[in-house]
Amino acid sequence: LEMGYQWRGLRHRGDFVYERLNLVTDMYEKTQNYNNQLDLQQQVNAAYAQLSGEKQGFSWNAGLRTEYTDRTLSHTLETSNYRYKQWHLFPTAQALWLFDKKQKLRAGFSRRIDRPTNRYLAPVRNHRHAEVEEIGNPELLPEIGNLAEVAYDKNWSRFSLNVTGYFNYVQNKIFKINRPYSRTTLIRSFANAGRTTSTGIDLSAEWGIAKWWRFFLAGNVYDFYISGDVDGLTVSRRSLNAALSANTTFTLARDLKLQWDASYVSRTITSQGEDTDLFLSGIALRYTFWEDRLTVGAQMQNIFNTNIQTLTIEGPGAYSSTEYTKYDRALLLSAGYRLNDKAKKGKAQKTEYGEKDF
């Protein structure tokens, strides 16, 4: 039996400043209602207990985690504070069957929380681009995800395979809400407007074709369903989605490797529209010197010039279709030298806010 307690706290303070150029005075002036000072404070107190066991190739664990969230957001455009206080329970259970050294079966259930970041909470109007203004919602609730999955792993001498079936149910799903603001501009906000489910199968395989050639392939196909109330309209939408990725590595010499990778994401629905498919591919060459201490590399991104995606939004009195295009291919050159083989790499502390905000 394992038990524990954890405390996490954060404070985000910042000034939102938006200025326009006055063509008469040739001076930048602050724009009313676009400037604000924000102070976000959040504390999470958590306690957990976990029980585990093992017998003759079978192992299991079950646990329960409880979290109490206390979040306060204040800003200068309003005198009142936004307060959110809530208890959450997170059960988890996992089981593992080892049939032999080369195959195993896993099954599990877990519940997770995804708290909204500053971008979604800040009640400050800002220009995302020329056609969209965005304002956060300080009353957003965290998303709660419930994941059940079963996975099978099998290894051969030069080939490995993983197949995973899963069902993911997300409560309090945060949707983007787009409304017409002017003839050419939408205003975007966020709301806990419904729920989503994803039911699918994930497959990955790695093949050592030869000593100098390895190939990896992964694919995910799932049924995606959205339901809820978006801006006063009942939404019930479904799409069959797919994602594919592949890479292959050629060892041209002992210290020289060539790698090609590709990824594809299919069309998918959103709460108010759809996103088209996207295909990306790149190639890289890597050479190491002096017992792998010095590394030089070259990487070409977007080699087929396919970095083009269209996002469509449709709602009451508004329609928007934006094509995001990056025509240029990018060549990246790199060089690195490792001074000490024995030096341990420091691990930066990861938080649920840091990676998303940056």
Predicted segments with their positions:
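Repeated loop/turn-to-beta-strand initiation elements of outer-membrane beta-barrel proteins
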Residues: 1, 57-60, 102-105, 158-161, ...
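Conserved C-terminal beta-signal and adjacent last beta-strands/turns
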Residues: 237-358
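Surface-exposed extracellular loop regions of Gram-negative outer-membrane beta-barrel proteins
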Residues: 13, 42-78, 86-92, 101-147, 167-188, 212-223, 245-266, ...
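Residues on the lipid-exposed face of transmembrane beta-strands in outer-membrane beta-barrel proteins
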Residues: 47-53, 93-97, 140, 150-154, ...
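Outer membrane beta-barrel strand-and-loop segments of large Gram-negative receptors
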Residues: 29-36, 137, 141, 156, ...
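Outer-membrane beta-barrel transmembrane domain signature of Gram-negative proteins
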Residues: 1-61, 98, 196-206, 218, ...
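Transmembrane beta-strands of outer-membrane beta-barrel pores
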Residues: 7-13, 55-57, 66-72, 109-115, ...
